[in-house]
C-alpha cells in the first residue's frame, strides 16, 4: 500500500516497479450522490466509498480505468421503491446494483467513458445491520460498496460456486483495507 496516496498497487505486470516507482491503475470515476438527509450524519461516508471502490478496482482482473459509476446514498424508503420497481420485492434492502447494459457492436468514441452502472445503498438498513452484527459502520459501508461494485463488473452469487468466488474476493479486498472477514461467525469478530 502506498501510504502517501492510499492506493493499492496494480496487480500482475502492471504492479512492477518502473525506475523505482510503483505503477498505479487508472481508477474508475466514481460519483457519490447523497439523496437522503440521514446520510449527512456520516461526514466521512464519501471518502470511505471512494477508498473501497479504488481498492477493489486495483484488485480485480477487470479493467475499470476508463469507466464511470454512480453510487446513490438513499434511505430505506428510497431503496424499497427501487427494490419493488426493479426486483418485484416490496421491502428495503441494504444495497442494490444496476449494471449498465453495454450495447454490442455499437461503436463509441475512444475517449468516451464506459458506464459500469449504479449502486444504491440504504442508510437505515446499513446502520441496523452494522449494529446487529457488531460491526463498525465504516466497515459495513466498505463491504456493501465493494459488494455492489463487484456486481457491476459481473460477479454474482446465484449459485454456491459464484457466491464462494465473490465472497472470497470481498474478503481479500476488505483485508487490504484492514477490515475483518464479514462472513466470519459473529463470536470471532467481537
Curated annotation (Swiss-Prot):
One of its GO terms (cellular component) is cytoplasm. It is an enzyme of class 3 (hydrolase). Its main location: cytoplasm. Keywords: Cytoplasm, Endonuclease, Hydrolase, Metal-binding, Nuclease, Ribosome biogenesis, rRNA processing, Zinc. It is found in: Cytoplasm. It holds the Pfam family YbeY. PROSITE patterns: UPF0054. One of its GO terms (molecular function) is RNA endonuclease activity. InterPro entries: MetalPrtase_cat_dom_sf_prd (IPR023091), YbeY (IPR002036), YbeY_CS (IPR020549). Its EC number is 3.1.-.-. Binds 1 zinc ion. GO terms for biological process: rRNA processing. Zn(2+) binds at residues 147, 151, 157. Residues 1-20 are annotated as: Disordered. Its cofactor is Zn(2+). Belongs to the endoribonuclease YbeY family. PANTHER family: ENDORIBONUCLEASE YBEY, CHLOROPLASTIC. Single strand-specific metallo-endoribonuclease involved in late-stage 70S ribosome quality control and in maturation of the 3' terminus of the 16S rRNA. This is Endoribonuclease YbeY.
Amino acid at each position: 500500500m502506498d501510504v502517501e496516496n492510499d492506493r493499492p498497487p496494480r496487480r500482475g505486470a502492471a504492479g512492477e516497479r518502473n525506475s523505482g516507482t510503483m505503477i498505479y491503475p487508472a481508477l474508475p470515476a466514481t460519483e457519490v450522490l447523497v439523496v437522503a438527509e440521514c446520510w449527512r450524519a456520516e461526514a466521512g461516508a464519501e471518502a470511505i466509498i471512494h477508498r473501497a471502490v479504488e481498492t477493489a478496482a486495483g484488485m480485480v482482473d477487470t479493467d475499470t480505468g476508463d469507466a464511470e459509476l454512480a453510487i446513490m446514498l438513499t434511505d430505506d424508503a428510497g431503496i424499497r421503491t427501487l427494490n419493488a420497481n426493479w426486483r418485484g420485492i416490496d421491502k428495503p434492502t441494504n444495497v442494490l446494483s444496476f449494471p449498465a447494459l453495454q450495447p454490442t457492436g455499437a461503436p463509441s468514441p475512444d475517449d468516451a467513458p464506459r458506464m459500469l452502472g449504479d449502486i444504491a445503498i440504504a442508510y437505515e438498513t446499513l446502520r441496523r445491520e452494522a449494529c446487529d452484527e457488531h460491526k463498525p459502520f465504516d466497515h459495513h459501508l466498505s463491504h456493501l460498496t465493494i459488494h455492489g461494485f463487484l456486481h457491476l463488473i459481473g460477479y454474482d452469487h446465484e449459485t454456491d460456486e459464484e457466491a464462494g468466488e465473490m465472497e472470497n474476493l470481498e474478503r481479500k479486498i476488505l483485508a487490504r483495507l484492514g477490515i475483518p472477514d464479514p462472513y466470519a461467525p459473529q463470536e470471532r469478530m467481537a
